[in-house]
Amino acid sequence: MDYYRKYAAIFLVTLSVFLHVLHSAPDVQDCPECTLQENPFFSQPGAPILQCMGCCFSRAYPTPLRSKKTMLVQKNVTSESTCCVAKSYNRVTVMGGFKVENHTACHCSTCYYHKS
């Protein structure tokens, strides 16, 4: 009987440690809003290269029946979202002739990457 109590105690201690670590970890889904942040790879001292980073909104909802009937490939869920993109930028040359966009303003807009 003591044999089972020992393993039960070890199990409970392990479970409580796991739950403590789980609740003390930061929330992974927390994402900062869309802002300019320095790109450490391309930036040089005195000449920072900025890029837009952060989160905007996204949502999913059931596809309305009226819309579903017009689809070639019907899907049950429709989603829409916006991405953090540059509102304005300057083209600059860095590190041996590479041209990059140095963002000057950001906003949430259409996700062009996901468009087909």
From Swiss-Prot:
Subunit structure as annotated in this protein's UniProt entry: Heterodimer. The active hormones thyrotropin, lutropin, follitropin and choriogonadotropin are heterodimers composed of CGA, a common alpha chain described here and a unique beta chain which confers their biological specificity to the hormones: TSHB for thyrotropin, LHB for lutropin, FSHB for follitropin and choriogonadotropin subunit beta/CGB for choriogonadotropin.
Keyword flag Glycoprotein: yes
Protein name: Glycoprotein hormones alpha chain
Keyword Acetylation tagged: no
Predominant localisation class: secreted
Cysteine pairings via disulfide bonds: C31-C55, C34-C84, C52-C106, C56-C108, C83-C111
Described purpose of this protein according to its UniProt entry: Shared alpha chain of the active heterodimeric glycoprotein hormones thyrotropin/thyroid stimulating hormone/TSH, lutropin/luteinizing hormone/LH, follitropin/follicle stimulating hormone/FSH and choriogonadotropin/CG. These hormones bind specific receptors on target cells that in turn activate downstream signaling pathways.
Family classification: Belongs to the glycoprotein hormones subunit alpha family.
Subcellular location: Secreted
GO molecular function, one term: hormone activity
Signal peptide: 1-24
One record GO biological process: positive regulation of transcription by RNA polymerase II
Organism superkingdom: Eukaryota
InterPro entries: Cystine-knot_cytokine (IPR029034), Glyco_hormone (IPR000476)
Residues of this chain annotated as glycosylated in UniProt: N76, N102
Record-linked Pfam families: Hormone_6
GO cellular component: extracellular region; extracellular space; follicle-stimulating hormone complex; Golgi lumen; pituitary gonadotropin complex
The organism's taxonomic lineage, starting at the top: Eukaryota, Metazoa, Chordata, Craniata, Vertebrata
Record gene name: CGA
SMART domains for this protein: GHA
